[in-house]
Curated annotation (Swiss-Prot):
InterPro entries, A to Z: DUF167 (IPR003746), YggU-like_sf (IPR036591)
Top-level taxon of origin: Archaea
Family listed: Belongs to the UPF0235 family.
PANTHER family, per the entry: UPF0235 PROTEIN C15ORF40
Name recorded for this polypeptide: UPF0235 protein PYRAB05010
Lineage: Archaea, Methanobacteriati, Methanobacteriota, Thermococci, Thermococcales
Annotated GO CC locations: cytoplasm
TM helices/strands, residue ranges: none
Length: 92
């Protein structure tokens, strides 16, 4: 669910669009992914843009979707942070 790489940390997330608020819901143990609630609808990339904005604000870093542009399951790179910082911000 979290993997430290040279560029930063890769998060494996599952996005739940149309939520009441943007938030980290918890961990989906079965899928091995972090559950992220996003207010935006999954239409024309709105949920992806909102996910990037939410995670960028949470970590204070640049965020990029590496895999899963059209799926709810995504691999996201948070640049310039380490694993401990990500765990602390996610409260894991």
């Amino acid at each position: 669910m979290l993997k430290e790489v040279r560029e930063g940390v890769i998060l494996r997330v599952i996005v739940k669009p149309n939520a009441r608020e943007n938030s980290i819901e918890g961990i989906d143990e079965w899928r091995g992914r972090i559950k992220v609630n996003i207010k935006a609808q999954p239409v024309k990339g709105k949920a992806n843009r909102e996910l990037i904005k939410f995670l960028s604000n949470l970590f204070g870093a640049e965020v990029e979707i590496l895999k899963g542009e059209t799926s709810r399951e995504k691999d996201v790179l948070v640049r310039g942070v380490n694993l401990e910082e990500v765990k602390r911000r996610l409260k894991l």
